[in-house]
Amino acid sequence: MQNRTWITDFRAKRMQIGISEQDMAVEAGLTTEYYRRLEQENQSVPQKVRKRLKDALIRLHPEPLTLLFDYVRIRFPTMDVKHIIEDVLRLKMKYLVQEPRGMYGYTSTYRIGDVMVLTSPLEEMGVLLELRGKGCRQFEAYLDGQKRTWYEFFRKCMKEKVVFKRVDLAVNDLVGMLDIPLLISKCRKEECVSVFRSFRAFRSGGLVSRQEQDSAHMGATLYIGSMQSDLYFCLYEKAYEQLVKNGTPLEQADIQNRFEIRLKNERADNAVYDLVSNENPEQTAFGIINRYVRFVDKESGKSREEWPLNPMWETFIGKHRNTLKLTTAPEPYTLERTLNWFSHQVAPTAKMLLLIDEKCGTSHVKDILDNTELRDKHRKIIQQKMRTVNEMIQMEDN
């Protein structure tokens, strides 16, 4: 980002949060006149002043960090898929598409957008709910319509004696509190004190360590712990991901960084139980983080165990910031994936055929479409797009 645009983007963030020029100046230890001049004259901002302003923003921001569920996989010990869909998820089963394929050994999938329910003829497999990132966001739209929270949904699941197979807790850094490249550097300098014995790092979409299957970020990505274990952390520069996907300028991204706590099996069970029991996201998330990792600053003459916490890390885990809250970001189901596929794989050929029809006076494309029979799957997807959330949910437990 160009030096002179930094204050423009910073001003936009300040105004979005609702912080006055005077409050920002006072918190940063600047005169109001000097700060106002920086903004109004779009002046170049020295690096030291930038740091003071950034630190002040963290302290003044009402929610510098938020917590989201970014992956939920739950196994229900039952073969009654209708009960799970209608009584637990509280969705109307008639709107779900059934597909004769599955994953993880399941043979059939009921789907509404990215919300997936998998079944198997084997009793020991039960019914599996799979919510990835977009699935979580879409399911939150249904929870909102039902006037339910994640806590209430999980309590309902627990009554079914479920097994939480995987849960990802995403701590979103909205203000650039974490410096991921610096944390990677600290890992290499042994300034990361952790129960885990391994870390892996990537930069600019390229490999720094060794090949990882789900590293698709332009910015820095850090894995702490083994991906084969039931608990590991993934830290990455989310703003770069949004730049690649949506073209969003780095400083304008809603989320700057993300710290993901990825939990499986008993670890996932324990985390959800703690969340539901206490409804204290700060305690649950940072209880896990603090138990397994901390970043320190090396001091000569002292043992590694005595090195002080790094100030940036100290702020992240709770000092000089407001308490972490569980939030939602509900999104409607869209045809984005289908439209992208159509745009890249079908549209060029379709356009060519339409032009040939136009120039040759034929109607091959129209004839093909007129004679195409929609399957039940396609009719249900049309219904999903035509119905409101309230039309597709069950408002009360049966």
What are these regions (language model features)?
Residues 1, 42, 52-53:
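N-terminal flexible/basic segments that precede or flank functional cores
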Residues 8-27, 328:
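Short basic helix-loop element that most often maps to the first helix and adjoining turn
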Residues 28-29, 39, 54, 339, ...:
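A general structural motif at alpha-helix termini
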Residues 29-45:
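Recognition helix of helix-turn-helix/homeodomain-like DNA-binding domains
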Residues 46-62:
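DNA major-groove recognition helix of helix-turn-helix/homeodomain DNA-binding modules
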Residues 10, 24-25, 35-38, 335:
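Conserved hydrophobic/aromatic packing and binding residues within compact polymer-binding modules
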Residues 2-4, 16, 59-333, 338-398:
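Structured, helix-rich domain cores that form ligand/interaction pockets
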